[in-house]
Amino acid sequence: MPAPRGILCRPRDIFTEQTVARLARTATITDLDAESDDGTGTVIATPIIRWLESQEAAGNPVDYFNQTVVVQAPSGTSEADVLVMLQALLDRHAMLRARVEEDAAGRWTLTVPEPGTVTAADCLHTIDVLTDDAVIQAGVRLNPAAGQMVSALWVKSTGRLVAIVHHLAIDGVSWRILLEDLNLAWAQHRAGQPVTLPQPGTSFQRWATLLAEHAHDPKVVAQTDTWRQIAATPAALSPASPETDTLNTAGNLAVNLDVETTQMLLGEVPAAFHTGINDILLIAFGLALAEFLGTGAERICIDVEGHGRDEELGADVDLSRTVGWFTAKYPVAMQAAGLTWSQVVSGDPALGAAIKTAKEQLRTLPDGLSYGMLRYLNDNVDLDAADPPIAFNYLGRQGAATADGSGDVWQICWDGLATVSPGVKPPIPLTHTLALNAGTVDTDTGPALCAIWTWAPSVLNHAQVSRLSQLWFDALTGICTHVRGGGGGLTPSDIVAGLSQEQIDELQRQYADS
């Protein structure tokens, strides 16, 4: 969190230390007179930005590569109000003002100008009704080379703001930061006060510099062979065709898991296996893929995306309020443990053993951030294998209900583009044959896991992906059944005693019988 009084305390420290006394020992004093880390100036391209650069080098258009969110404004909001809000965000968050510069070799760097140089009036267009053409034209106005990272539509008839931000400047976590700032700015503006938003802790500029430095750290370089072996795993699906498989021709399927199962996945299941929900979802995806593809115990390589905000790179790194594209992308080779599908869906004891084995496989992987650092930021390392054709990304919990019941808040509308045709998507080639983007959304009855599937129609069809989607949900349900029956337990990476899984299981059996 920011340190307005010169004390640095990160959110994760609160959860780790849990008492005021222990928290006080971890908090550090910052120098309020030190030069501000405002994120302006030259920004080194990060691994994920280098990846996008490689997409352009391959002939794929990237100017329209964006994230779009629809925000419902408080009742009575005017266009003038929106301009004030948008200007506050542009001035506070440096990457929203970034400009891409390309050298003679096609290599990118980014430059961030001072606050005030990008105006909200140049980014915002007002319309009466949201239409396909309006969204298309707003997307076309994005121009990273000209510093046009933001293009927004104010829809007067509905009081909604359509925010289109180039992916170079935004990720899923960033939207939560922007929404928080929108509401803070709104409260100040409505009270007649000048809008003053808190400064982010660590700028994206400094973060990019840290990544470039760590890419040459001997400990990071030592992980090269491990990544090379993983990346060499044979592809489980044919690649997408860049000529025919594009965003506007891709197959799409969105399915929600029931609330009861989702609630178990958010709490009891990760606790039972001493891991995070990301690992559980990925392990279940690996089981479903093995059944779908009929690969048995063969390894399946998956291109995994993580949030990439690893604050361990520096003692004083605080990214809790930093807007930018932090995504880490890296290959993971999943290996099913020879289970029958009936064992999976029934929650058989063998499923628990398979989950523990897969969990340990994931724990032995290097930090996912290091793959991109080595591949894109260290010219002395050769990691040039093609990306796996299957992708997985868990976006976390989306759309949490606001605690303010007055309606005088800005809220993201997750169905805000429901009336817009899929045809507004640009003809950008798909980067994966199959992609699963999952997130937990709040519904009227509770949280529900939402699976959004995207696939290349030259390789897969709707019926096949529908079956795979059901297999994934069946695997997750089977895991929940296993935990309800008392399944779970520790694995070797959870303890420091150096015990094998067999020894841990035997101790747990003895303890259970005592």
Sequence positions of predicted segments:
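Acyl/amide activation-and-transfer machinery of modular secondary-metabolite enzymes
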Residues: I48-P74, D103-L130, A134-Q137, A146-S151, ...
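Short, compositionally simple motifs enriched in small residues
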Residues: M1-P2, L23, V82, L281
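Extended, hydrophobic beta-loop-alpha segments that form or line the acyl/peptidyl-thioester binding
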Residues: C9-R12, H93, R97, L179-L182, ...
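Phosphopantetheinylated carrier protein domains
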Residues: M1-Q18
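Short amphipathic alpha-helices and their capping loops
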Residues: A21, R25-N60, L83-T131, A146-Q148, ...
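Active-site-proximal acidic secondary-structure segment that organizes catalysis
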Residues: A3, V150-Q205, Q464-T481
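His-Asp-centered acyl/peptidyl-transfer active-site segments
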Residues: D38-G41, A58-N66, L83, A94-M95, ...
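Acyl activation and transfer enzymes in specialized metabolism, enriched
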Residues: P74-R97, A163-E180, G251-A297, D348-I355, ...
